[in-house]
């Protein structure tokens, strides 16, 4: 069922990532919520945002304000998925997600978010990058995405926001605490 292969996993020449979805109502490790408290901004709950696995979030293992906070990643479905962990999604569907959180290597995330502490590591399923997609307003499951395998590439947030307003803009990320550090 997985279409990505090799080490690192690739599909049609592009790097692959595993995905899951979550909702926790917290502002996340990029500080995308009011400075006082732990609540998230409304746009952070309902937009295309993601928690990245540790090595991508910050190669120095920071748990707050990682080096890729605010970066946008275009995910394109391969039509594959990890058997027993998701379901098929048509190949070629692309959506862009902004990194606003960390998927920590702690329970229950170890199988997905543990890529080790050095570049080139991979999770239990063979992926160098894992993205846990915010589903606070069913924005992920509402598209029919059930933990699809994807390819990924870094893209410009504002260009993607202009195409689909569910992708946060750079000015929206500017409200986050980590945008000012």
Swiss-Prot record:
Belongs to the glycosyl hydrolase 45 (cellulase K) family. It comes from Mytilus edulis (Blue mussel). The lineage of its organism: Eukaryota, Metazoa, Spiralia, Lophotrochozoa, Mollusca. Digestive gland. It is an enzyme of class 3 (hydrolase). Transmembrane segments: none annotated. The keyword Disulfide bond applies. Active towards the soluble carboxymethylcellulose (CMC). Possesses expansin activity too. Keywords: Carbohydrate metabolism, Cellulose degradation, Disulfide bond, Glycosidase, Hydrolase, Polysaccharide degradation. Disulfide bonds join 4-16, 30-69, 32-176, 65-178, 72-157, 103-113. Its EC number is 3.2.1.4. InterPro entries: RlpA-like_sf. One of its GO terms (molecular function) is cellulase activity. It catalyses: Endohydrolysis of (1->4)-beta-D-glucosidic linkages in cellulose, lichenin and cereal beta-D-glucans. GO terms for biological process: cellulose catabolic process. Optimum temperature is 30-50 degrees Celsius. SUPFAM superfamilies: Barwin-like endoglucanases. This is Endoglucanase. The active site is at residues 24, 132. Optimum pH is 4.6.
């Amino acid at each position: 069922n997985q279409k990505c292969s090799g080490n690192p996993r690739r599909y049609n020449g592009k790097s692959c990532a595993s995905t899951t979805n979550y909702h926790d109502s917290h502002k996340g490790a990029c500080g995308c919520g009011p400075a006082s408290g732990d609540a998230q901004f409304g746009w952070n709950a309902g937009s295309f945002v993601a928690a990245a696995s540790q090595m991508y979030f910050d190669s120095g293992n920071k748990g707050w304000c990682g080096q890729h906070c605010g970066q946008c990643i275009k995910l394109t479905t391969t039509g594959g998925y990890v058997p027993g962990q998701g379901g098929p999604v048509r190949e070629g569907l692309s959506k862009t997600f902004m990194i606003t959180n960390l998927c920590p290597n702690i329970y229950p995330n170890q199988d997905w978010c543990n890529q080790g502490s050095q570049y080139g590591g991979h999770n239990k399923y063979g992926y160098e990058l894992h993205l846990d997609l915010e589903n606070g307003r069913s924005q992920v499951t509402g598209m029919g995405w059930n933990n699809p395998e994807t390819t990924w590439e870094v893209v410009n947030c504002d260009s993607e926001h202009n195409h689909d307003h569910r992708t946060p803009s750079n000015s929206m990320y500017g409200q986050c605490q980590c945008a000012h550090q």
